Swiss-Prot record:
InterPro entries: Dual-sp_phosphatase_cat-dom (IPR000340), MKP (IPR008343), Prot-tyrosine_phosphatase-like (IPR029021), Rhodanese-like_dom (IPR001763), Rhodanese-like_dom_sf (IPR036873), Tyr_Pase_dom (IPR000387), TYR_PHOSPHATASE_DUAL_dom (IPR020422). GO terms for biological process: negative regulation of ERK1 and ERK2 cascade; signal transduction. Strongly inhibited by sodium orthovanadate. GO terms for molecular function: MAP kinase tyrosine phosphatase activity; MAP kinase tyrosine/serine/threonine phosphatase activity; protein serine/threonine phosphatase activity; protein tyrosine/threonine phosphatase activity. Belongs to the protein-tyrosine phosphatase family. Non-receptor class dual specificity subfamily. Substrate binds at residues 331-337. Residues 31-41 have a biased composition (Gly residues). The keyword Cytoplasm applies. Residues 244-387 form the Tyrosine-protein phosphatase domain. Keywords: Cytoplasm, Hydrolase, Protein phosphatase. The gene is Dusp7. Residues 68-187 form the Rhodanese domain. This is Dual specificity protein phosphatase 7. It comes from Rattus norvegicus.
Length: 419
């Protein structure tokens, strides 16, 4: 079966606000709610002038090994979807909707009330004053709160807990660092093949791997996959290309053209649906009747409007997953076009901001490198969906900045929230 989307290449003109993807705070840092008290800081905690108290990944590992976390209360401040995918053992999730976050900022909402699980509520209530409370987000490394800066979720919760008399700290390096170094203490719901890479991403959407594709002709072809593969703009496939498709969600796999032609791989992962995001690569098993195909005729080029196909692509992925069939999303190298479609799917189906969706995919597949213009289309898609990061931490007048991957010139952007 084949379901091919047809349409002429459309040049995507990006607005000033959509010309780059946003960062926000510096990589590895995030604004805090205040300086906080340094009382009760024990071994493994570090502070500096104005710094919020933290504990190291090594300290947490030793606590879990020695006492099984009996003297700890771990609070995961990431979005619920990321917590469900993987988290540190014994952690309680504290993802906060924007409305509740505003109430929390005003001081009229107890932290216990934002914990959804009754058993976790009781555990928090009985241990928050007696145990060491350790909060973590995705990747905060060193945190120097800046005067007047709006509070992040992590900063807001940490400050409130310390104001309430709790011995509260944040985990230096966040979940990414701890999982990289001590994965045996993390609980995950994804296949082992999608384990995060050894280089954790920062909590801010990193565009260092993005490319502004060369101005090649619209007639370029993906017909053959050479032994030394390149994306259609001539960018080489990174040497860290995974050997097999990567599981992003249950039944959703991200891969390359080679994966789509390997029956052993398709059978191993139960893949019956294949989304081919290229104009000319063949659907290898189209006539056998065993696989359902959809083809999106888009080249990896700045002029291409991939976003026009988001609704059909998302519907195709949903159809496969609803039938509990594996669906492979691939382009040529599996780093640009297919990544863009996968990120769009996470944004719509999981209500993730572009920051969170991008980081979610990058944790599974470290070598992603979307076309820079495709990221602009994802920013527009984020606006269409009305999404924002869970921090909800800047006013409309604030400007966020990010640099291009080529010359590091700064471009202002005001649509993407940092996490």
């Amino acid at each position: 079966m084949k379901n091919q989307l047809r349409g002429p290449p459309v040049r995507a003109h990006m607005s000033t606000s959509g010309a780059a993807a946003a960062g926000g705070t510096r990589a590895g840092s995030e604004p805090g709610a205040g300086s906080g008290s340094s009382a009760g800081i024990g071994a493994g905690a570090t502070t500096g002038a104005g710094a919020m108290p933290c504990k190291s990944a090594e300290w947490l590992q030793e606590e879990l090994e020695a006492r099984g976390g009996a003297s700890l209360l771990l609070l995961d401040c990431r979005p619920h979807e990321l917590f469900e995918s993987s988290h540190i053992e014994t952690a309680i999730n504290l993802a906060i909707p924007g409305l509740m976050l505003r109430r929390l900022r005003k001081g009229n909402l107890p932290i216990r009330s934002i914990i959804p699980n009754h058993a976790d509520k009781e555990r928090f209530a009985t241990r928050c004053k007696a145990a060491t409370v350790l909060l973590y987000d995705e990747a905060t490394a060193e945190w120097q709160p800046e005067p007047g800066a709006p509070a992040s979720v992590l900063g807001l919760l940490l400050q409130k807990l310390r104001d309430d008399g709790c011995q509260a700290y944040y985990l230096q390096g966040g979940f990414n660092k701890f999982q990289t170094e001590y994965s045996e203490h993390c609980e995950t719901n994804v296949d082992s093949s999608s384990s995060p890479s050894g280089s954790p991403p920062t909590s801010v959407l990193g565009l260092g791997g993005l490319r502004i594709s060369s101005d090649c002709s619209d007639g370029e072809s993906d017909r053959e996959l050479p032994s030394s593969a390149t994306e259609s703009d001539g960018s080489p496939v990174p040497s860290s290309q995974p050997a097999f498709p990567v599981q992003i969600l249950p039944y959703l796999y991200l891969g390359c053209a080679k994966d789509s032609t390997n029956l052993d791989v398709l059978g191993k992962y139960g893949i019956k649906y294949i989304l081919n995001v290229t104009p000319n690569l063949p659907n290898a098993f189209e006539h056998g009747g065993e696989f359902t195909y959809k083809q999106i005729p888009i080249s990896d080029h700045w002029s291409q409007n991939l976003s026009q196909f988001f609704p059909e692509a998302i519907s195709f992925i949903d159809e496969a997953r609803s039938k509990k069939c594996g669906v492979l999303v691939h382009c040529l190298a599996g780093i640009s076009r297919s990544v863009t479609v996968t990120v769009a799917y996470l944004m719509q189906k999981m209500n993730l901001s572009l920051n969170d969706a991008y980081d979610f995919v990058k944790r599974k597949k470290s070598n992603i490198s979307p076309n820079f213009n495709f990221m602009g289309q994802l920013l527009d898609f984020e606006r269409t969906l009305g999404l924002s990061s869970p921090c909800d931490n800047h006013t409309p007048s604030e400007q966020l900045y990010f640099s291009t991957p080529t010359n590091h010139n700064l471009f202002p952007i005001n649509t993407l929230e940092s996490t």
